[in-house]
Amino acid sequence: MIDVLFLAIALAMDAFAVSIGLGAKQANTAFSSAAKAKSMLLKLALMAALYFGVAQGVMPLIGYLLGSALLGWLASAAPWIGCIILIGLGAKMLYEAIQGDHEEEELGLDDNQSVDHKLMGTMAIATSIDAMAAGFTLNLLAVNAWLACLIIALVTALFSFFGVYLGRQSGTWLEDKAEVVGGVVLIAIGIKMVL
């Protein structure tokens, strides 16, 4: 079960990084009162937790179900395929962190744009595509996949909620660091699968 927790934390890092960026963007927005600013920050944190948590919980479930269908055909190669998927996802996260590649910028979110449900949904899907690929590897871990997806969703929701507040206080300097941690953890889990 510790592998699931590490996987959940690693998969949450993309959403965490975007949430930090959203919180930092919120810090640059002028409000008519401190109460209005607090209210809008709470709304943004709750939206991030809900959207990112649900997307990160559903996508690995889809990957798990697709992987279950293919596992019979690929049984002998499955650990290596899972290893390659996780190492590839980890390397992608490391590359994006080094390049300073931020999803909210790719989606065209600027300081003057408000975050609505459509934009939040788009960001949630964009940050959870990797989780679908990682869901394939749940077939290779001795865990209940449904429980694992619930844990992934809850961990992502918590990281996203607090990421908004952390971003409000710290700005964007933590975004890349979160992605580095996630990338390293995914690579480590991938290597562990074949050892």
Swiss-Prot record:
GO cellular component: plasma membrane
Compartment(s): Cell inner membrane
UniProt keywords, alphabetically: Cell inner membrane, Cell membrane, Ion transport, Manganese, Membrane, Transmembrane, Transmembrane helix, Transport
Membrane topology: Multi-pass membrane protein
Keyword Methyltransferase: no
Regions crossing the membrane: 4-24, 46-66, 69-89, 123-143, 146-166, 171-191
UniProt GO molecular function: manganese ion transmembrane transporter activity
Pfam families, A to Z: Mntp
Task performed by this protein: Probably functions as a manganese efflux pump.
Family classification: Belongs to the MntP (TC 9.B.29) family.
HAMAP family, alphabetized: MntP_pump
Protein's name according to its UniProt entry: Putative manganese efflux pump MntP
Gene assigned in the entry: mntP
